[in-house]
């Protein structure tokens, strides 16, 4: 086979590979979102155990939830803009790494302050990661029919994650 034959040959499985890669990327994005949604709902169910284990007062216990929500809600729009400027993939990966590291800190927390601080950092990571997911899906799936399927899968995972988190939180506590 000459160089010209290779150039004029029928296209190979590139389109199938590209399509497969897009759906694998969607799988990764959905796993990241599932992690974020699971965490939010598991913590709510686990609050009584957290209160007993770390000796929280009722008023201080609210900060376990509030620290996360303040960071997440406060940074969501900014995180989306940062993703537009320096790259959504980069921001997603940074956010996921920050979120995962903060989750580990939450798991090993021995004090109220450490848990509240780790929850704040978790909110930062969650905002970074989740702010760019839909933008990435829109860019990866430009064809309307495929985009609708991808957003449907993403929406299902996010919704199911909330339900699974409540059940899992109850089972773990």
Residues of each region from the PLM?
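Transmembrane-helix bundle of Major Facilitator Superfamily
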Residues: 2-173
């Amino acid at each position: 086979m000459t160089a010209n034959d290779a150039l004029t040959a029928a296209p190979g499985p590139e389109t199938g590979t590209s399509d497969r890669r897009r759906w694998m990327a969607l799988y990764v994005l959905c796993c990241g979102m599932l992690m974020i949604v699971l965490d939010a709902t598991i913590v709510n169910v686990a609050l009584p155990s957290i209160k007993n284990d770390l000796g929280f007062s009722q008023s201080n216990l609210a900060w376990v939830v509030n620290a996360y929500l303040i960071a997440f809600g406060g940074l969501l729009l900014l995180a989306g803009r940062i993703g537009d400027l320096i790259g959504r993939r980069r921001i997603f990966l940074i956010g996921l790494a920050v979120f995962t590291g903060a989750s580990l800190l939450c798991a090993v927390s021995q004090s109220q302050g450490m848990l509240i601080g780790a929850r704040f950092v978790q909110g930062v990571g969650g905002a970074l990661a989740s702010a760019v997911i839909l933008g990435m899906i829109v860019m990866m799936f430009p064809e309307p029919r495929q985009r609708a399927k991808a957003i449907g899968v993403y929406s299902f995972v996010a919704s199911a994650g909330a339900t699974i988190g409540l059940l899992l939180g109850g089972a773990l506590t």
